[in-house]
């Protein structure tokens, strides 16, 4: 594989790690209501586990409330059960037509737990970025031995890989700092 291809592949892997982290962080509750909080919830619909977003509309009338309106009233109990069984820790209020989720304010202890969780997610993303860098550098070194790539070209490629790595690590740190600030803001 050519050196440019190796760098492009490693960069793509690093980008995927950052995108995945961004997606993970968007599901972390930070004190205000967001329809994304319910993205991972699956509802039993005609015997199949179906994403909640495909069987109901989800709105946020204010910063502390999420309203789930099922497209079929018969699903309201199943949706309520799915929300109760989820790790969100929110008790749904069912009025027969829609479900209201009142988000209680986060306690200091819960905020710290969420920060710890997001820090772990950020660290996992950093590990993925480092692994992509290591794999690329190993492949570059291998190409010097087997393909006859010149040493100076390999050194330049390794330096380029390090720059790309540093850029993605910085992005991860920025995403984490932003989410930490959002979580800790009362």
Curated annotation (Swiss-Prot):
Pfam entry (one): RRF
InterPro entries per UniProt: Ribosome_recyc_fac, Ribosome_recyc_fac_dom, RRF_sf
GO MF entry, a single one: ribosomal large subunit binding
Cellular compartment(s): Cytoplasm
SUPFAM superfamilies: Ribosome recycling factor, RRF
Transmembrane segment boundaries: none
GO biological processes: translational termination
Keywords: Cytoplasm, Protein biosynthesis
GO cellular component: cytoplasm
NCBIfam families assigned to the protein according to its UniProt record, in alphabetical order: frr (TIGR00496)
Protein name: Ribosome-recycling factor
Organism from which the protein derives: Porphyromonas gingivalis (strain ATCC BAA-308 / W83)
Gene this protein is translated from: frr
């Amino acid at each position: 594989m050519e050196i440019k291809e190796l760098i492009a592949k490693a960069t793509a892997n690093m980008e995927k790690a950052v995108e995945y982290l961004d997606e993970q962080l968007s599901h972390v509750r930070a004190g205000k209501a967001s329809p994304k909080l319910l993205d991972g919830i699956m509802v039993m619909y005609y015997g199949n586990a179906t994403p909640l977003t495909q069987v109901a509309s989800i709105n946020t009338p204010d910063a502390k409330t999420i309203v789930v309106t099922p497209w079929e009233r018969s699903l309201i109990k199943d949706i309520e059960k799915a929300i109760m069984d989820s790790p969100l820790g929110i008790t749904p209020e069912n009025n027969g037509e829609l479900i209201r989720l009142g988000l209680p304010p986060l306690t200091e202890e819960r905020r710290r737990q969420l920060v710890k969780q997001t820090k772990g997610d950020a660290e996992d993303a950093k590990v993925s970025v480092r692994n992509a860098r290591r794999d690329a550098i190993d492949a570059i070194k291998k190409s010097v031995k087997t393909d006859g790539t010149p040493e100076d070209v390999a050194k330049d490629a390794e330096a380029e890989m390090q720059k790309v790595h540093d850029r993605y690590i910085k992005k991860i740190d920025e995403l984490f700092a932003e989410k930490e600030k959002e979580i800790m803001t009362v």
